[in-house]
């Protein structure tokens, strides 16, 4: 997501709510919807990524990454989100600020 500086605190709060929901409904073992990994990263957007000395744009970039053990994990995740009370507000920020959304993507490289 590319988020203007004046709404970063709101997006931070939504991500914290999402992370709690993820911990409540997902796991790295078979006890819940099974993930390989989940993480969220955040960074100031650079004017020129090749030269950070050029400064920042004033936007903040967020990346939410979820990788499931089984392909059906994405469907299980979306089904579970249907009963999550905070889903509408989270999906609203994703729709408003998300410039790229990859669902059910294939991991093609890793360490």
Kindly give the residue locations of the regions a language model identified.
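Short S/T/G/P-rich N-terminal loop/turn motif that feeds into the first structured element of a domain
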Residues: 1-63, 67-80, 96-111
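Amphipathic, Lys/Arg-enriched alpha-helical "gate/interface" segment within cytosolic domains
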Residues: 78-80, 85, 91
């Amino acid at each position: 997501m590319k988020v203007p500086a004046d709404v970063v605190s709101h997006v931070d709060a939504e991500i914290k709510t999402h992370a709690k929901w993820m911990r409540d409904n997902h796991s790295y073992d078979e006890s819940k919807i099974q993930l390989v990994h989940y993480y969220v990263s955040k960074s100031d957007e650079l004017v020129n990524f090749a030269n950070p000395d050029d400064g920042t744009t004033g936007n903040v970039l967020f990346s939410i990454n979820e990788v499931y053990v089984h392909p059906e994990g994405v469907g299980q995740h979306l089904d579970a989100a249907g009963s999550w009370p905070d889903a509408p507000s989270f999906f609203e920020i994703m729709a408003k600020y998300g410039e790229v959304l990859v669902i059910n993507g294939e991991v093609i490289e890793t360490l």
